Amino acid sequence: MQESRQQKSGGGFELLFDEDRLKIYYNKIFPFSLMFKWISYNKLNAGQKALTSLDEGISSNYFHFREFSFTLANDVYCRYLCFKTAEQFKETLVDRVPYKIDIGAVYNIPPDRHNASDKRAFIPVQKEMVFDIDMNDYDDVRTCCTGANVCEKCWEFLKIAMIVLTDILVEDFDFENVLWVFSGRRGIHAWICDESAREMNNEMRSAVVSYCNLGVGNENSGRTTLSYPLHPRLQSIYKKLLPEFKRIIIDEHNLLSVEKHRKKFLDYCPDLTTKNKVDAIW
């Protein structure tokens, strides 16, 4: 049986998967009851009680009408999967052993019947709003790792991202249910689970994303010069992050001491006097 992880030459570990271990994980560890409770949002069928064990056969059309997709071994991709109960969900995962599970929208009919109806009649009715933050987005400012590699120092950036985005979503948009989860490889996902978010159309979602996006990207994307005075939300973020800047950027990553990182970092600075002063000091 293949080892589940191996140590890399540069430190840290690279995760390796094998079907035997995944089958044990799905059979013994995977939180099926919690997943069912979360994704059904207590929208159970008439006469049903809250789920307490998998063998109760508790059903929910809200769960049943939700699309799942699996990525199996050798990158075999399966769409339009759905399940009536948590027990059926478990049986399928243990049997098919997916390497990746994607949770899709809730449709107006069970997704496995999408070919039995007019495509215009198969429509999504609800879906959580999800923000995806990848670790490689921080390659300009982290000195420890690159790409999909992640260490404890890297996670400091993701922790800050969670704090900032949660503040915006809760304080500016009045969302209450923000679930942060590890994406499974190189980043984190924020699932906004409020019903108001699940009912948003694409235009509404784009407006929220646009509000949260400064447009200050990595070296391969466009950069935005901020105008002053700063927007009140940016002022609040600045005050909150200033102490973390010294701890993470200066002390932990020692970013300004390495010329190539310092140059890349100073490219973000709009004030020439400040850039020259920092460059001279370091």
Say what each PLM segment does.
Residues Q2-S183, E195-N202, A207-V209, L214-W282:
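Signature for HUH/AEP ssDNA processing cores
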Residues I188-E195:
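A short beta-strand motif that forms the metal-chelation/ATP-contact edge
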